[in-house]
Curated annotation (Swiss-Prot):
Organism lineage string: Eukaryota, Fungi, Dikarya, Ascomycota, Taphrinomycotina
GO CC terms: cytoplasm; cytosol; mitochondrion; nucleus
InterPro entries noted in UniProt: MYG1_exonuclease
Disulfide bonds: none
GO terms assigned for molecular function: hydrolase activity
Family statement: Belongs to the MYG1 family.
Name of the protein in question: MYG1 protein C694.04c
Amino acid sequence: MNNLVKIATHSGTFHADEALAVYMLRRLDRFSGAQIVRSRDPQVLDSCDIIVDVGGKYDGIKYFDHHQREFNDTFSPKYSTRLSSAGLIYKHFGREVIHAVLPQLKINEQDLETLYEKVYQSFVEGLDANDNGISAYPAGLKPSFKAAMSLPEMVSSFLPAWNSEKQDDQTYLECFQKASDLMGTWFVRSVEHYALSWLPAKTLAREAILKAKDSPILIVDQFFPWKGHLFDIEKELGIENQFKYAIYSDGKAWRVQAVSIDPTSFTCRLPLPEPWRGIRDEKLSELTGIPGCIFVHASGFIGGNQTFEGALEMARKALDFPQN
């Protein structure tokens, strides 16, 4: 560990983006234990090893500021959100940081790229947008409530109070370090979730989809969160809208679920037949001609059967139902 290594960022009010940027750098061996220098003095900044969110320069090596008039860099061409210092550091060092957070992780290059982008998309991009004043929603929409506990607002809560007697640089540095640790805690949790839970689930979902071949029925024969992956994998494989129903166990019985038109919609590609909706147990079995029926939801988005074979038959009959 080299105690002379210095990470510089600006003095004064701090924000979530540089708090995370500094945390990510400090996870790397070459910046582990680095001194944090908070200044706007060009000579002080230039004496440091790496400079984030200040300095008016970006070279991808030492200088990582995004405030220049001409700066319009994004994470990749598919993104429109301009990078903040968090996105800049993640873009250049994110793969290394992931390995530093999870040194035991055995992962191939393709999965690393998937994880690298997912963490940006789900965690870092929101900080980039916030720091650049980009709203997630169109202007003019009136929010239903005030969400006062976003990460940027949590970071702001570490700033010394306006009427505090302690307004010196050392106090601000100590507060910044606490804010950086907070951002690091949530960043690590995000990386762990996507690496250890989300990515393995995507692998299983892909296997189930490939096993289905050209069938419109997806069979999920073990428990894992598959719904969020279905649409991405369909798109990756060029088979959008192939699946109409998914069969899976709820631990006691089997469910047949109509696939929605997109991940956030309640509208289904092919709801279960209207005459089945709201009917239960023996009446439903008599109506469908399928033993073991438990229910069909009133909206037709899901139904249940006591056996896998029964749930599968419900899906098959629903596909052939004339009113659908």
